[in-house]
UniProtKB/Swiss-Prot annotation:
Positions bound to Mg(2+): D689, D693
Subcellular location, record wording: Cell membrane
Protein name: Copper-exporting P-type ATPase
One family name in Pfam for this protein: Hydrolase
UniProt xrefs under InterPro entries: ATPase_P-typ_cyto_dom_N, ATPase_P-typ_P_site, ATPase_P-typ_TM_dom_sf, ATPase_P-typ_transduc_dom_A_sf, HAD-like_sf, HAD_sf, Heavy-metal-associated_CS, HMA_Cu_ion-bd
Gene3D superfamilies (alphabetical): 3.30.70.100, Calcium-transporting ATPase, cytoplasmic domain N (3.40.1110.10), Calcium-transporting ATPase, cytoplasmic transduction domain A (2.70.150.10), HAD superfamily/HAD-like (3.40.50.1000)
Length: 794
């Protein structure tokens, strides 16, 4: 009898003991299963017989009951992939593995991202699965470490290329004889000389192609290595056969193809070297983000200052940062004041004043004051680390546009081998009957011109460069699907407060004398209302001395009453003044004017006498009007969503040029309003910054979070714009359009190259070495085209 297996599964969605009991009951109905579900720990402890019940059965039972299984994500560096057929093969094997929810393998980044159930499989088991099909894998390395590894790989490829080129160059001269009849020294035509030069290229330099081909064929698949190994081996061994015949009849000089095999391998190595070199440039955005980090920190330990590596800083450490130094980690100022350049995060060039208890962000620059900071977030929890993580995930993700290329790549190599065999048969049977050499040359040309690499690189390289360029501009796409969908947007919905406006009310107008302002600010200083803060701040900038208040009373929906230094103050709306019998007829015109401008106007009366008026408004961001104009230039409709009344909303809409307003919307109604717009066949982007925007961000086709907003909004969004600059919204759409256009160009070239190249080779119109050169350069051209995105202007 099989021994019972024990596992623990994390469960999401449980709210009470009844949930746990329901899951437990359904699990225990399975054969040979004993389950215990704990609602507090949100875990199920299960003993089961793997012969009668699989780990997947357990997961499906929990999900059918209406709850979720908590998966973990593994990120692996995959070693040994050469083309799209490799990445597709690994992806298929991983997705068929028990316990794996979803796996994606990216040829460009050479990464695998796997969502899996830890109760059913493990990272070690996943690595073994990859190794079993002929590749290698390891837990993902840090960007800096991987970058240095890539440099070593590039150097190794260059050495191989140089050796191969030195050996193949003399053989290339023999082509001049075949093509143009040019006379060269007889040594170059000697079969032994050609054999000695071609053999190390074929079996030492080119051994990697044999290893790759063997591993793939052993596992029932085929990749680029199979095509190269078949094509070059056919040329090499046919030449060897002709050479052996020559040994027995030295009077007849054989027609050898040693130069074909050696030059083909050299050209393919050259293409792979250029491709690797270009691919390293696609990760520059990540390297540049990493370079923003401080390398070390000045920490206060045992009452002594000491410099330590950044990685040694722990939460709770006290850091001393001097003028001109980078803030090492996220933290809170506990001593000192300064101004900080946060442009790397917000794009705002003006330094921000910081005082005690203010938060600071790691990697920003301290400008002019010494400060002591308590570390609150270190390592992978810092703001910059989060940004790097988002960019990495986006660069490693797949866009839906890639699906067709993935499907074709899976069948590509077997089809090409079939076409090569068919070409050989047609040539030897019909085109040049009984002539072996022309048939072989045409078949070799078909094998070596076909390039699955270009298909595999077409989308991910563009995604990598596009998301990297966007990140440099403060735009974070969370994945390839989001960068693809963003270019389809035709309507942008903007939340008003904190998105269109600064989110902080200020006094815009004051009509009254100094005493009225003094009493007004004195009464408001104890209030927590945002409008009160605006009034107090205004009075302080005017150097008004605040007085003590007695008998303060807030009247809901009306205003406030207070007694200050024996004077009775009344502040509020028209109705309040009428209730208190204050004559306000002189204020009507100016108050109406303020309200039409979207401002909140408050009347001031002292001892029953009207003394003035204050207008407070949440001011519009400087960039809002320009951003909306740019969206209109892109033929995108702009809608404002706000809880304000119609008149206030319309005033702001008129100021910034917004097409449509949806006013008096409660926070919980925002998602429903987005859904209503979607029923009109609109592709909606919702832009917001607050907790109450999160449901609407999720409902929208694309949710865009303002980076200065709450973590909840940022988590719910598909795109994050760092800082509060709305100009980044049209830039995000432009980046998406440029990236998708670039992907389409790459796919057109990759498909077009193979569709045109294979028939031309089959017709015998291409020499194998020319076909090989075309194949080598096709993938390089795709990567080079993607690199053009680095120069796109947003």
């Amino acid at each position: 009898m099989t021994e019972q297996k024990k596992t623990t599964i994390g469960i999401t969605g449980m709210t009470c003991a009844a949930c746990a009991n329901r899951i437990e009951k359904n699990l225990n109905k399975l054969d040979d299963v004993e389950a215990n579900v704990n609602v507090t720990t949100e875990k199920a402890t299960i003993s089961y017989n793997p012969e009668s019940t699989s780990a997947d059965d357990l997961t499906k039972t929990i999900e059918k009951t209406g709850y979720g299984v908590l998966n973990e994500t593994a990120e692996l560096d995959v070693i040994g992939m050469t083309c799209a057929a490799c990445s597709n093969r690994i992806e298929k094997v991983l997705n068929r593995t028990d316990g794996v929810d979803q796996a994606t393998v990216n040829l460009t980044t050479e990464n695998a991202t796997i969502s899996y159930n830890p109760s059913a499989t493990s990272v070690d088991a996943l690595i073994k699965k990859i190794q079993k099909i002929g590749y290698d894998a390891q837990p993902k390395k840090e960007v800096a470490e991987k970058s240095s590894q890539k440099e070593l790989e590039l150097r190794s490829k260059l050495v191989k290329l140089i050796i191969s080129a030195v050996l193949a160059a003399p053989l290339l001269l023999t082509m001049l004889v075949h093509l143009f009849g040019i006379q060269i020294p007889s040594i170059f035509m000697n079969p032994w000389f050609q054999f000695i030069l071609a053999t190390p290229v074929q079996f030492i330099i080119g051994w990697q192609f044999y290893v790759g081909a063997y591993k793939n064929l052993r596992n029932g698949s085929a990749n680029m290595d199979v095509l190269v190994a078949l094509g070059t081996s056919a040329a090499y061994f046919y030449s060897l056969y002709e050479m052996v015949k020559w040994l027995f009849n030295a009077n007849v000089m054989p027609h050898l193809y040693f130069e074909t095999s050696a030059v083909l391998i050299t050209l393919i190595l050259f293409g792979k070297y250029l491709e690797t070199r270009a691919k390293t440039q696609t990760t520059n955005a990540l390297s540049e983000l990493l370079n923003l980090q401080a390398k070390e920190a000045r920490v206060l330990r045992d009452n002594k200052e000491q410099m330590i590596p950044l990685n040694d800083v722990v939460e709770g450490d006290y850091l001393i940062i001097k003028p001109g130094e980078k803030i090492p980690v996220d933290g809170k100022i506990i001593k000192g004041k300064t101004s900080i350049d946060e442009s790397m995060l917000t794009g705002e060039s003006m330094p921000v004043e910081k005082v005690q208890d203010d938060n600071v962000i790691g990697s920003t620059m301290n400008k002019n004051g010494s400060i002591t900071v308590k570390a609150t977030k270190v390592g992978k929890d810092t703001a910059l680390a989060s940004i790097i993580k988002v960019v990495e995930e986006a660069q490693g993700s797949k866009a839906p546009i890639q699906r067709l290329a993935d499907v074709i790549s899976g069948y590509f190599v077997p089809i090409v081998v079939g076409i090569a065999v068919l070409t050989f048969i047609i040539w030897i049977a019909f085109v040049q009957q009984g002539q072996f050499e022309p048939a072989l040359v045409a078949a070799i040309a078909v094998l070596v011109i076909a390039c699955p690499c270009a298909l595999g690189l077409a989308t991910p390289t563009s995604i990598m460069v596009g998301t990297g360029k966007a990140a440099e501009n403060g735009i974070l796409f969370k994945g390839g699907e989001h960068i693809e969908r963003t270019h389809q947007i035709d309507t942008v919905v903007l939340d008003k407060t904190g998105t269109i406006t600064n989110g902080k009310p200020v006094v815009t107008d004051f009509d009254g004398d100094e005493e009225a302002l003094q009493l007004l600010a004195s009464a408001e200083k104890g209030s927590e209302h945002p409008l009160a803060d605006a009034i107090v701040n205004y009075a302080q900038t005017m150097n008004i001395k605040l007085l003590d208040t007695t008998d303060f009373e807030a009247v809901p929906g009306r205003g406030i009453k207070a007694n200050i230094s024996g004077k009775n103050l009344i502040v509020g709306n028209r109705q309040f003044m009428n209730d208190e019998n204050v004559d306000i007829k002189d204020s009507e015109d100016i108050m109406t004017q303020f309200e039409k401008s979207g401002k909140t106007a408050m009347l001031i009366a002292i001892n029953q006498e009207y003394r003035g008026m204050v207008a407070v408004a949440d001011t519009v961001k400087d960039s809002t009007a320009t951003a909306i104009k740019q969206l209109h230039d892109l033929n995108i409709k702009v809608v404002m969503l706000t809880g304000d009344n119609e008149r206030t909303a319309q005033a702001i809409a008129n100021e910034v040029g917004i097409d449509t307003i949806i006013a008096q919307v409660l926070p919980e109604e925002k998602a429903a309003k987005i859904k209503s717009l979607q029923t009109q066949d609109k592709t909606i982007a919702m832009v917001g910054d607050g907790v109450n925007d999160a449901p609407a961000l999720v409902q929208a086709d694309i949710g865009i979070a303002i980076g200065t907003g709450t973590e909840v909004a940022i988590e719910a969004a598909d795109v994050t714009i760092l800082g509060g600059d709305l100009l980044l919204i049209p830039k995000a759409i432009k980046a998406s359009k440029a990236t998708i256009r670039n992907i389409r160009q790459n796919l057109f070239w990759a498909f077009g190259y193979n569709v045109a190249g294979i028939p031309i080779a089959a017709l015998g119109l291409l020499a194998p070495w020319i076909a090989g050169a075309a194949m080598a350069l096709s993938s390089v051209s795709v990567v080079t085209n993607a690199l053009r995105l680095k120069r796109m202007k947003l």
